[in-house]
Amino acid sequence: MAAGEPRSLLFFQKPVTFEDVAVNFTQEEWDCLDASQRVLYQDVMSETFKNLTSVARIFLHKPELITKLEQEEEQWRETRVLQASQAGPPFFCYTCGKCFSRRSYLYSHQFVHNPKLTNSCSQCGKLFRSPKSLSYHRRMHLGERPFCCTLCDKTYCDASGLSRHRRVHLGYRPHSCSVCGKSFRDQSELKRHQKIHQNQEPVDGNQECTLRIPGTQAEFQTPIARSQRSIQGLLDVNHAPVARSQEPIFRTEGPMAQNQASVLKNQAPVTRTQAPITGTLCQDARSNSHPVKPSRLNVFCCPHCSLTFSKKSYLSRHQKAHLTEPPNYCFHCSKSFSSFSRLVRHQQTHWKQKSYLCPICDLSFGEKEGLMDHWRGYKGKDLCQSSHHKCRVILGQWLGFSHDVPTMAGEEWKHGGDQSPPRIHTPRRRGLREKACKGDKTKEAVSILKHK
């Protein structure tokens, strides 16, 4: 303002309008702008209008430029997404260049470019479309689980988790499989189950499967049961290589061939009955009486014989039987075992390391089963050779048979009259107890474990 102007003219100056500060583009200039520049222009104009409204402290109508920009943005966004949907996935975001497999993912992503419509978490920085989703997310940081089940007292962060949990108590399974008819509680469980039926084709009863031994040209045919279903491609022998680099050598004679049948008996259980090994190849006696369930298919086939297994670990354990020298081999008695733990348990018999000691007598055993059989001997044979009566009484107390008095050293107790069998009192009873041992009645406070 000039110094000579009167002071009263300040109150009659025209207020600043939006058109005075707005930047306008012609149609040719607007067409030259890319998507990011258009978004930046819209944000600047919207922020300018907000600042002007806050300074004026009065309600101002939206200018034509702001209304036009908002309408054009919505129209541009719809046309871009429509073009992408007609062309098919991936759906492309023209703002940042990201691609999405579904249109819903693209819609959710477009809210990130508009800060006015996003709700960000102050702890992890994640963005959400609605404040409700943000409040559910904050419960995870705070540890709040307000939704509680009245039947089992389990708590959940949101109502959807509680509703899914209630299906367990109600037995509600709305999702059913169209192939086998099984029903599930969630859609995710159904999709996980449907993967079992994928690539499973029924095999005719007269169809044969050709198997080849790796490293050789030998091939043989093996029939496949009608109820068995095999996944195409898994019957190829390439998925089961031999555990050693050299070619397998089959046993036909010697001590190792005699122990081969015992090795196969200790292998993992299979769904088919195994026949004894004769010659160089194993034969499989299959039984068609019980159909195979689709969820328990034997898809891992042995390249040396016609056996099939449901797990790859069972197949690798079975292939050890075809090797010349099994890994779990005892050098003392030439016995072979399917696992290393059984070999260690067997070698204790040679090393005389009997770690299971009887607490009553001085006998020791190499296996736990032997000690348990020794403890149960009070009803059968007299396995405890040191003290018959002492061993029987203590074992009876341990096993809960203290009221049953066994025969001691061939002496028979007569029931009836004044003669009665001696009473055995456990040391857990308090006070002085009247003990009886071989007819001698004494009063003592010591335990029956020390009485002889």
Curated annotation (Swiss-Prot):
It holds the Pfam family KRAB. One of its GO terms (biological process) is autosome genomic imprinting. The record marks R185 as: Crucial for 5-methylcytosine recognition. Gene3D superfamilies: 6.10.140.140, Classic Zinc Finger. Residues 410-452 are annotated as: Disordered. InterPro entries: KRAB (IPR001909), KRAB_dom_sf (IPR036051), Znf_C2H2_sf (IPR036236), Znf_C2H2_type (IPR013087). Residues 16-88 form the KRAB domain. GO terms for molecular function: chromatin binding; DNA-binding transcription factor activity, RNA polymerase II-specific; RNA polymerase II transcription regulatory region sequence-specific DNA binding; zinc ion binding. A zinc finger (C2H2-type) spans 91-113, 119-141, 147-169, 175-197, 300-322, 328-350, 356-378. Keywords: Developmental protein, Diabetes mellitus, Disease variant, DNA-binding, Metal-binding, Nucleus, Repeat, Repressor, Transcription, Transcription regulation, Zinc, Zinc-finger. One of its GO terms (cellular component) is nucleus. The keyword Cytoplasm does not apply. It is found in: Nucleus. Residues 433-444 have a biased composition (Basic and acidic residues). Transcription regulator required to maintain maternal and paternal gene imprinting, a process by which gene expression is restricted in a parent of origin-specific manner by epigenetic modification of genomic DNA and chromatin, including DNA methylation. Acts by controlling DNA methylation during the earliest multicellular stages of development at multiple imprinting control regions (ICRs). Acts together with ZNF445, but ZNF445 seems to be the major factor in human early embryonic imprinting maintenance. In contrast, in mice, ZFP57 plays the predominant role in imprinting maintenance. It is linked to Diabetes mellitus, transient neonatal, 1: An autosomal dominant form of diabetes mellitus defined by the onset of mild-to-severe hyperglycemia within the first month of life. In about half of the neonates, diabetes is transient and resolves at a median age of 3 months, whereas the rest have a permanent form of diabetes. The KRAB domain is required for function as transcriptional repressor. Belongs to the krueppel C2H2-type zinc-finger protein family. ZFP57 subfamily. This is Zinc finger protein 57 homolog.
